[in-house]
Each structure stands twice: as structure tokens, then as C-alpha cells.
From Swiss-Prot:
Species this chain originates from: Ralstonia nicotianae (strain ATCC BAA-1114 / GMI1000)
One GO CC annotation: cytosol
SUPFAM superfamilies: HD-domain/PDEase-like
EC numbers on record: 6.1.1.14
The keyword ATP-binding appears for this protein: yes
High-level lineage: Bacteria, Pseudomonadati, Pseudomonadota, Betaproteobacteria, Burkholderiales
InterPro entries: DALR_anticod-bd, Gly-tRNA-synth_bsu, Gly-tRNA-synth_heterodimer
SMART domains (UniProt xref): DALR_1 (SM00836)
Name under which the protein is recorded: Glycine--tRNA ligase beta subunit
Alphabetized GO MF terms: arginine-tRNA ligase activity; ATP binding; glycine-tRNA ligase activity
Location of this chain's protein in the cell: Cytoplasm
Amino acid sequence: MSTLLIELLTEELPPKALARLGEAFAQSLFDGLSAQGLLEEGAQVEGFATPRRLAASITGVRRAAPDRELREKVLPVNIAFDAEGKPTAPLTKKLAALAKSIGADTIAPESLERAPDGKAESLFHRYTARGAVLADGLQAALSQTIAGLPIPKVMIYQRPNGDNVQFVRPAHRLIALLDDEIIPAGVLGLQSGNVTLGHRFLSAGEIIIPHATAYASTLKSQGKVIAGYAERKEAIRAELLKAAGADTVVMPEALLDEVNALVEWPVVYPCHFEEQFLAVPQECLILTMQTNQKYFALTDAQGHLRNRFLIVSNLATETPQAIIEGNERVVRPRLADARFFFEHDKKKPLADRVPQLARVVYHNKIGTQLERVSRLQAIAGQLAEKLGAEVAHASRAALLAKADLLTDMVGEFPELQGTMGTYYARHDGEAEDVALACSEHYQPRFAGDALPGTATGTVVALADKLETLVGIWGIGLAPTGEKDPFALRRHALGILRMLIEKPLALGIAEVLEAAAASFEGIAAVKPDLAAITDFLYDRLRGYLKDKGYSTNEVEAVVSQRPQRLDDIVARLEAVRAFAALPQAEALAAANKRITNILKKTDITIGSVQPQLLREDAERALHQAVATSEPHVHDAFARGDFTTALKTLASLREAVDSFFDGVMVMADDTALRDNRLALLGELHGLMNRVADISKLAA
């Protein structure tokens, strides 16, 4: 199979956009050629992206697409011909347009074939569509690709001939090779060839790509360029790990991607900074190295920051001392700034900063951060009391939770909000759980993030998310479609995770009511607790499905809208165990039938009157329910939901016999009402743990 290589050589591309640009460039070219029939079955594409080039290698490329036999509907016969069988004006006009579109001179009416189209007899034209040749197809695909790239910001630059060109960065060369043959194509004022340039500093002169399959190897050997984005990234990772030795590299993927987009021939060098800077919280030092300098910090086996770091350079040299010293010199003022912020912030206790939160607007309809802190104290205090946590500690933590927003360090690095609050609270002599709550109350920050580790941190985190959810929703900013500017979906998930995973003996209604009460007197906030409750249950469904439970299992439990969620996993596991029983399907179907019967009746269902049980089957069912009921209730009280549901299996025979031999809606109203009462008792028993009718197919 033939291989097509396309490379666009440019000035340095935006680092944060490189991965996306590379993927889009390769995939768009592939899709464009495929749409024209220029790719064989099983064709594959490999993308390349470096700071100075976008490229794609496509295997299975045809020189020309195969011809296609096409059949196109023209017009219904009754419109195409008049009463005398002569062509009408609509037919003449249609044939002229069709001929023009397919490149034919004319199309004679007598050449058309007649056939039914499903509604009426119509005229059809058969013709052969010539397949596109590669040069034309590539030109179309390349132009479409360039026009459709996800470019963050377009530049306007001039070609040597004075023409203005718009692209993400100035483009200098274009390669288009089918195996070893140059395919003529042009874009951005460039014409295709087989010549490129290598590394800006480590390679001199032009490089000829001899064959499309030799692109990556030629660039690597002659140009000092690792063209593959993923290959280069893994090379950086390997070199970092090698240089770290026994230490651990702090290596977030986002930083690795950004550095990867800055180098074509990565080389890792170790550097140092003075130990005195280690007195500053390591989160500050790590963040300043990552954000400002794109350096990789190192920690020891205990997770403590080392006074050395790694840089990824685009220059390979046998005498790297100048590079190392230059980077050490550059990082020193950054670390000194962090130390200054830390020392200056410590001079003012967090508690003294709280009144200044009155100058920080949270939302113009809700008030300032100081007013918000007051609400957090009220909510956290109630929750702490309900859970048996330290109310005073919860209130103190809520008071201090937002104070670090006014510190110099958080002003410089907003990502450190909460983290710095913990350091400053410890310095001020606050209780350890109060200090930890300053950072823990933001948790979980994202899906899969750790939950707060302390009871104080948990209640303040719950209060923070409840206050945001109820307050922002209450001013009419509920999530809509893709818009969720206040991350209410994330806050809702955090609330649910804490209720379930901690677990917490709190009901959904009581925590929402506690939050709503804190907004009393604020006219702009109109909490819609019913809508928020629906929202929480919808998020709960998604959370449980992500945990691996089926839709039926989830609906069996969530459809009952349980208030407390601390036992919801046990209920789900019980439902799963019940569903595996041989009696489950029949009982689920019966429960569904009972539910439908009870929904349709408009009478008040009372208690069962044994003397009105006339049929053997209804007496047997009443006895079976009476026998099972204490066992189900005892198991439920113990939290043994699996046993509670499995006990229902003994009811199957009695339930089947009842529906086979008893007319529920009897003419005698006394008998009817008594049988409905019996079904009501059975329904209550069967749905004590979950609505098992949701398991019915």
C-alpha cells in the first residue's frame, strides 16, 4: 500500500494548542481523502506535531478513486411528460442542471429509465462518476483541513511576494509525498516539495525526505527532531525519571504536555536552589516552578520537597553548565517572591482578615464573602450538631475558611486558596482540625478527588457546597444545557459523595432546609428546594451508574427517593443479590402489577379484615405476608437489606396463586376493598428496601 506524507513547517506554534492542532490536522486530512474515495479499506493515519511542524502519514492511499456507477432520481413521470408524452419544461430544466452538475453535455429524455420510487413511477438517470485523482483530492482535503483547524488566534503575515496570509503562525514549507513522488499541492502561499528543515539550533541546512515512510527516522537522524508528539512526551518522561534517581518527579500531565510542545529534541538537566527556600510551604515553591518556569520539582521518599529540580531543554550540549546556571539564576527571584509573600502574610492573623471580606463581593444578588461566611457558620454549626461533631470548631473553621483569599500568596497564586489557609491557621495557633478544614472545605474539587479527612472539614465542606447550590439556584442561575458557571453539578456531586462515602447520617431534605434557612431575609434568593432535590436525585443516578450499577438497579432504589444516603450502597447490593434469585423476575412483575392496580384505585385502603378472605389463595397470601413481615422488618432494622429482600422469595408461590385464582376488583365492594388492602400490605412489604418492580423487564 502507498503512503502519503504531508508536512507543514511553521514558526513556533502555541504550546497549549499543539496537541489539538496535531490531532485535527491528521484526522481532517484522513477524513477528507476518505470522503473522496482515495483511501483503501484498512487505511490508517499517524499524526506528528512539534513546536515547528504539523504532519500526517497516511497508509493505504490510492492514486485515483474508483469510478462509481450512480443512479439519480430526476422527476415523477406525471410531472416529466405532458398528456401527449412530450417532455415538460420542468424536465428540460432538471436535465440541464443535472448535466451541468455531472459534467455531461446533455442528457436525452429517452435515455432515462422508469421505475417506481415507492410513491409513484419516476424517471432515473444512470451515469458513471469518475473518481477523483490524488492531486485534486489532496488539494481539496488540504484546503479544507487548513480552514477547519481549531486555531486559538489567527495571525496575519506577509509572504515574500507581499501577499497577506492568515494562519496560526507563519508557514514556510509544505511537503506532499506519495511514497517517493512529490504530489503537487498548494496552501498558504506554499507549493509542495520534499524538503524540510530540522531542529532550529542543532541542525543545519535543508533535509530531503526520500520517502514518505522515512519521515520520522530522517528527521530524527539528520534533523535532531522527534516528530511524534506521543513519542517525544514519553522520551521526556523517561529522561525525567532517569535524572530523578531515588527521588520522585512532580510531573502533572498538563505540565508534561506544555513542555513537550516547547521542544523538538528534549534534554533533561538537573538544577538546584538554596535550602533556605524550603522554609516556604512546598506547594508554593512547586507551583511557582511549574507555572512561571515550566520546571519539574522533586520530592523525597516521604513526599518532602528537595532543593533540586529538573528542566527540559531544547538544546543538547556536552557543556550544559551555562544552561543549568541560567535556569538556577532565573528561578531564584521567583522563590524569593514566594518567601516574601509567605513571611508577609504571616504577620497578620487570618482572624484579623475576616472583616475585610466585606470588601469582596461574592455575588451582587447574594452579598459579600463576609456575609457568606456568616451563612457558612450557621449551616456548619447545624450540621456539626446533628452529626455530633465539635460545633465550636466547625463554626471557627467556617469563619476562617475564606480569609486566605485576602493574602498576598493567594492573590499571586489563586490555586493555593485553602492550602495557604491551613498553613496560616497553624501559624496562628488554631486547632489542627480547624486549620485542616481551611483546605478540606474545598474538597472534593473534581470527580475522583479525595473527601475531607476530618469531621470539621467535612461539615464545612458540606456547608460550603450547600450554600452555593441553594443560593446560586435561588437567584435563578440553575445549570442549563452546557452552561454551569458556578459548577453546581460539581457541588451537587460533592454533597452526594460525602453523604454516601463518609457516610453521613443526614437526610437530603434536612441539609437543604438548613442551607435555605441561612438565606432568610435576602429577598433576591428564592430557594426552590423541590427543583434542587430533583437535581440531586438526577446527579445521584449518574453517580451510581458510574459506580457500575445497572439502570434497573439504580431505579429500584432511587425511584423511592430515599432521604438518607448512608445506606444506599447496601440497598443496591441487596437489589443486585435479589435480582439473581430465580424468583426475582416473577416477583418483580407481580409488584409492577400490584403498583398499577393500586394507582388506579381512588379509594382509601384500610387494613385487612381476615373474616372477609373468602378464597384459599387470598388466605394463603395473607398468611405468607404475616409470616414474612417480622423477618423483613427485623432484617431492615439491622440494615441487612439483602436478607430482607431474599425473604420475599418465599412469597412467590402465594403471589402467583393469588393472581391466578382471585378476582381483585370483585363486584362486592367489601371483598374488593379487602383484597386491595391485602395488596397494599404486600406492596409495602415488597418495597421496604427498594421498588423491585423496576427490575421487571
